Amino acid sequence: METAQQLDKPALDTNDAARDKAINEQVTMTQDTPYPDQTVGNPFVDDPKMRLRDVEVFYDDNQAIHGVSLDIGKNEVVSLIGPSGCGKSTFLRCLNRMNDTIDICKVKGSLHLESQDLYDPKLDVVELRARVGMVFQKPNPFPKSIYDNVAYGPRIHGLANKKYDLDEIVETSLRKAGLWEEVKDRLHAPGTGLSGGQQQRLCIARTIAVSPEVVLMDEPCSALDPIATAKIEELISELSESYTIAIVTHSMQQAARVSSRTAYFHLGRLVEMNDTETVFTKPEHDLTEAYITGRFG
């Protein structure tokens, strides 16, 4: 369980030249190519795990997300793609209320995890974040041992009555994260002493240790080398057998490799969502095609 101080904050820095350039390119594109009246493709599924309708996000008076509606299916891997500043990470953080940590942020719309209203005032947000876990862009292991990083959540949520039970949860989580064989003989070593790729897999183990239903990943490989990235991508495929996964990525190649459906965001709007192969080989909207062919972004 991450504290507010340990969370990566959304990119709100207007001095970020690359981000500003990407936003300006998006504005220029929409001057020539208007948004569709509604999202192109197939953003909805039967019997969704998460049902999201007319989602809007504001930072004070600045609207970051404009009326996004989509479904995420059970045990589906969905990729959210788009240029810097398009709102994909902001949208992802709505799904387990990480945006609550930002005082000026306000979320509107209907967001449900099956029948549960995610923004019900009576909802225990800590419990929600156990059901909908998050893996961040930069690995953020706690300053604790490898064992205690994974055991932290189960202890907080009372998932283990005995040390034997806790040991089993830790081992199972590390195995699912593909890390057990690498750390089983040094479980009490600091988690911060692992390599970057190992740290990210430790964070994934920490997330799944509380048995979430959904795992959100915000650019989980952006700070990793190609070998570590390949391990995370293989892990995503394996985890999808047990969990529903939504991943934000700047890498279109990664989206193509790991996801069954892909959603393209542009200046806070969902332009197109469809099965991944269709989005990348036969995009239906000109803005999507312009992005995936490298004309901007």
UniProtKB/Swiss-Prot annotation:
Residues 50-292 form the ABC transporter domain. This is Phosphate import ATP-binding protein PstB. Its EC number is 7.3.2.1. CDD domains: ABC_PstB_phosphate_transporter (cd03260). The keyword ATP-binding applies. One of its GO terms (cellular component) is plasma membrane. It is found in: Cell inner membrane. Keywords: ATP-binding, Cell inner membrane, Cell membrane, Membrane, Nucleotide-binding, Phosphate transport, Translocase, Transport. The complex is composed of two ATP-binding proteins (PstB), two transmembrane proteins (PstC and PstA) and a solute-binding protein (PstS). It catalyses: phosphate(out) + ATP + H2O = ADP + 2 phosphate(in) + H(+). ATP binds at residues 82-89. It holds the Pfam family ABC_tran. Belongs to the ABC transporter superfamily. Phosphate importer (TC 3.A.1.7) family. Its main location: membrane. It is a peripheral membrane protein. Part of the ABC transporter complex PstSACB involved in phosphate import. Responsible for energy coupling to the transport system. One of its GO terms (biological process) is phosphate ion transmembrane transport. It is an enzyme of class 7 (translocase). One of its GO terms (molecular function) is ATPase-coupled phosphate ion transmembrane transporter activity.
